[in-house]
């Protein structure tokens, strides 16, 4: 499929083709294809898959139509992550067939203090998001690498970044402020909150399951290797356990959670 075909957008809008969703981690890429022509929009993808152990010796690939097996790409100097994105794009192209791929949506962990809603990607936005890499060094670089690779490979294909931090913009300022001098707020030090896309999905799903009672005061848990809690009222975030970084809050698989700064100072002085 040519670049022009991949990036074709119908004159009637973005509701007649397919949308690819990417969730890029440090060594894995999960992807799903949704039919934008379905109304209401489907909660389950028409096709999905993942590539795992990218950059490692045993990188594997699987999708709805393909059992798990080694992912083999040409050794042509491309970075492993870019090679994996190109491989997935080729598989998507084959799966799309005569349909139109009208856009790509990316999970991006950190939108910083600037981005409170999904945003169409361009060079300026990409530069902004790169500046937030220090705030999420284990997550942010890989989503941006995928975005940059697609910008280069299919420059006319619309890409949209959806942020894990956006859902928590509704928190009162008193919840966002840290116990530090006020001037650090202007430096971006504040409680951002994460797992927002997961919580947004729950906010959309709860009324279907429980009706109007779900619009009251509700505590929602995102539990996995990374974990957090979110307090909602009227289906909007009011408080969350994660703060400035994804290390805060609950104790997790490889993250300490809330930690007394005095403990760190003690270890620095005694070890």
Positions of predicted regions on the chain:
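Conserved phosphate-binding catalytic cores of ATP/NTP-utilizing and phosphoryl-transfer enzymes
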Residues: 6-9, 13-15, 142-152, 197-218
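Short glycine-rich, Thr/Ser-proximal phosphate-binding strand/loop in the N-terminal lobe
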Residues: 19-21, 28-78
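Conserved active-site and cofactor/substrate-binding residues in soluble primary-metabolism enzymes
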Residues: 26, 79-83, 120, 124, ...
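Conserved active-site "lid/cap" helical segment
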Residues: 55-102, 146-148
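Short beta-strand-loop/turn "lid" adjacent to the catalytic site in phosphate-handling enzymes
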Residues: 92-139, 158-160, 167-175
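General beta-strand structural signal in soluble alpha/beta enzymes
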Residues: 106, 137-140, 158-163, 219-221, ...
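Glycine-rich phosphate-binding loop of actin/hexokinase-like ATP-binding domains
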Residues: 167-270
């Amino acid at each position: 499929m040519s670049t022009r075909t991949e990036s074709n957008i119908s004159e009637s809008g973005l509701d007649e083709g397919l949308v690819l969703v990417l969730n890029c981690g440090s060594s894995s890429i999960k992807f799903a294809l949704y039919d934008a022509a379905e109304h209401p929009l489907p909660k389950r993808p028409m096709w999905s898959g993942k590539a795992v152990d990218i950059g490692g010796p045993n990188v594997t690939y699987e999708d709805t139509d393909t059992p798990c097996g080694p992912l083999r790409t040409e050794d042509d100097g491309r970075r492993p992550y870019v090679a994996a994105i190109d491989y997935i794009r080729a598989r998507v192209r084959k799966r799309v067939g005569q349909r139109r791929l009208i856009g790509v949506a990316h999970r991006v962990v950190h939108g910083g203090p600037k981005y409170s809603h999904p945003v169409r990607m361009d060079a300026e936005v990409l530069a902004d998001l790169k500046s937030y890499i220090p705030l999420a060094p284990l997550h942010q670089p890989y989503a941006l690498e995928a975005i940059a690779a697609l910008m280069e490979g299919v420059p006319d294909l619309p890409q949209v970044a959806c942020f894990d931090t956006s859902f928590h913009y509704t928190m009162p300022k008193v919840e966002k402020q840290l116990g530090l001098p006020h001037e650090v707020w202007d430096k971006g030090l504040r409680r951002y909150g994460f797992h927002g896309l997961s919580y947004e999905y729950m906010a959309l799903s709860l009324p279907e399951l429980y009706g109007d009672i779900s619009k009251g005061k509700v505590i929602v848990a995102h539990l996995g290797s990374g974990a957090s809690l979110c307090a909602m009222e009227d289906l909007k975030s009011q408080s969350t356990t994660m703060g400035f970084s994804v290390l805060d809050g609950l104790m997790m698989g490889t993250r300490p959670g809330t930690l007394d700064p005095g403990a760190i100072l003690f270890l620095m002085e005694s070890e």
